[in-house]
Amino acid sequence: MAEKLDDAARAKAVASLADSGWEDVQGRDAIHKTFVFKNFTRAFGWMTQVAIVAEKMDHHPEWSNVYKTVEVTLATHDVGGLSELDVTLAQKMDRLAQ
């Protein structure tokens, strides 16, 4: 089972993801990023790839899609905040978006 990141691990994880656009969610132990693609097909194709990865991880994002933009929030509900699962999924999302 996942464990909530302690303050030091959380700060390190968020700092490592900040360069690629991930940000803290105000008032919540979560991270957020806006992905913008060339068009709807690319956005939806990326979401499909991420869905397969997320299902294999048994860790699912909160997300929404409007045309070529995908808003993503990551947190581990079972632990009430960020876990290593969120960091790993964020990194995989970034790689798939390249």
From Swiss-Prot:
Keywords: Lyase. Its EC number is 4.2.1.96. SUPFAM superfamilies: PCD-like. GO terms for biological process: tetrahydrobiopterin biosynthetic process. One of its GO terms (molecular function) is 4-alpha-hydroxytetrahydrobiopterin dehydratase activity. CDD domains: PCD_DCoH_subfamily_b (cd00914). It comes from the Bacteria. It catalyses: (4aS,6R)-4a-hydroxy-L-erythro-5,6,7,8-tetrahydrobiopterin = (6R)-L-erythro-6,7-dihydrobiopterin + H2O. It is an enzyme of class 4 (lyase). Pfam families: Pterin_4a (PF01329). HAMAP family: Pterin_4_alpha (MF_00434). Belongs to the pterin-4-alpha-carbinolamine dehydratase family. This is Putative pterin-4-alpha-carbinolamine dehydratase. It comes from Jannaschia sp. (strain CCS1).
